[in-house]
Amino acid sequence: MDERIISSETVDAEEVSFETSLRPQNLSQYIGQDKVKNNLTVFIEAATLRNEALDHVLLYGPPGLGKTTLAMVIASEMGSQIKTTSGPAIERPGDLATILTSLEPGDVLFIDEIHRLSRAIEEILYPAMEDYCLDIVIGTGPTARSVRLDLPPFTLIGATTRAGLLSAPLRDRFGVIDHLEFYTEEQLTEIVLRTSNILDTKIDDLGAREIARRSRGTPRIANRLLKRVRDFAQVRGNGTVTEKLAKEALTLLQVDPRGLDTIDQKLLHTIIQSFRGGPVGLDTIAASIGEERETIEDMQEPYLLQIGFLQRTPRGRIVTETAYNHLGISYEKEV
């Protein structure tokens, strides 16, 4: 499958480096997620006043909304070092033990995709999170013995796109659980303007708003679209991103005014044309459009549900009248 310009996942190492260069250093520079920021400000200040490690934090929500960035900002606000890893990277208990024993007092351990930790790894985390200790088994067979090692106070920040896959015992050990929401058009416009300033790209307010409007409520997509529109401005314009140029560029990139691309439209058209608008099961949809179920659940559904183009029911997915109107298809409600 071709790379999607509106994918909310990072696509390569270059984009990871690009995102790193744009990251804010503190909560005051972090745009959006105001409720989360306000609460974290209080929790961080309280922990600092008590000279304690911040409670463990779980951040969940669709990809591209700034979970990793927020983890970095939390560490910066705490004046702490941060060590980063991911669920798939921790394959054996020894991998986690090595990371935990390398922590210094007050450090932040960030685990992305924490829902992908195995149960064996989770069980090692329980005492580490609750009591700052690590139980390890030395030897094998009848001579094996358990040794408890003390760990320094630390903060675990877990990030996940699928909080429902976390086991209850692990989820319950997080003192702070925050859901990151899609961004508003105004917030994304502010992000586009900030990024354009960092990139030394000329852009007017209407140009920034046009990019924001098509960014699916996701900063990562907004920044990626800005980079591509900037190319059009330099090659086919005078170097300035205007509303007119942004519209032309994004149309050529096949991103419509609501942020849908050809894959989104294919999904909606398939449900409408092949299944009379639904309800239809997700596995059937996936087979019909040649996508994996998990890809649809993580990458397409959240935004289509958010803007009211899709409904999730016990019987399956249904395309809404709003989506019909957007696609220019006559909507006939079944009696």
From Swiss-Prot:
It is found in: Cytoplasm. Keywords: ATP-binding, Cytoplasm, DNA damage, DNA recombination, DNA repair, DNA-binding, Hydrolase, Nucleotide-binding. Residues 1-183 are annotated as: Large ATPase domain (RuvB-L). Its EC number is 3.6.4.-. DNA binds at R293, R312, R317. CDD domains: AAA (cd00009). One of its GO terms (cellular component) is Holliday junction resolvase complex. GO terms for molecular function: ATP binding; ATP hydrolysis activity; four-way junction DNA binding; four-way junction helicase activity. Residues 257-335 are annotated as: Head domain (RuvB-H). Signal peptide: none annotated. ATP binds at L22, R23, G64, K67, T68, T69, E130, D131, Y132, R173, Y183, R220. Its main location: cytoplasm. GO terms for biological process: DNA recombination; DNA repair. Residues 184-254 are annotated as: Small ATPAse domain (RuvB-S). It holds the Pfam family RuvB_C. Mg(2+) binds at T68. Coiled coil: none annotated. SMART domains: AAA (SM00382). Homohexamer. Forms an RuvA(8)-RuvB(12)-Holliday junction (HJ) complex. HJ DNA is sandwiched between 2 RuvA tetramers; dsDNA enters through RuvA and exits via RuvB. An RuvB hexamer assembles on each DNA strand where it exits the tetramer. Each RuvB hexamer is contacted by two RuvA subunits (via domain III) on 2 adjacent RuvB subunits; this complex drives branch migration. In the full resolvosome a probable DNA-RuvA(4)-RuvB(12)-RuvC(2) complex forms which resolves the HJ. HAMAP family: DNA_HJ_migration_RuvB. Belongs to the RuvB family. Has 3 domains, the large (RuvB-L) and small ATPase (RuvB-S) domains and the C-terminal head (RuvB-H) domain. The head domain binds DNA, while the ATPase domains jointly bind ATP, ADP or are empty depending on the state of the subunit in the translocation cycle. During a single DNA translocation step the structure of each domain remains the same, but their relative positions change. PANTHER family: HOLLIDAY JUNCTION BRANCH MIGRATION COMPLEX SUBUNIT RUVB, PTHR42848. The RuvA-RuvB-RuvC complex processes Holliday junction (HJ) DNA during genetic recombination and DNA repair, while the RuvA-RuvB complex plays an important role in the rescue of blocked DNA replication forks via replication fork reversal (RFR). RuvA specifically binds to HJ cruciform DNA, conferring on it an open structure. The RuvB hexamer acts as an ATP-dependent pump, pulling dsDNA into and through the RuvAB complex. RuvB forms 2 homohexamers on either side of HJ DNA bound by 1 or 2 RuvA tetramers; 4 subunits per hexamer contact DNA at a time. This is Holliday junction branch migration complex subunit RuvB. It comes from Listeria monocytogenes serovar 1/2a (strain ATCC BAA-679 / EGD-e). The gene is ruvB.
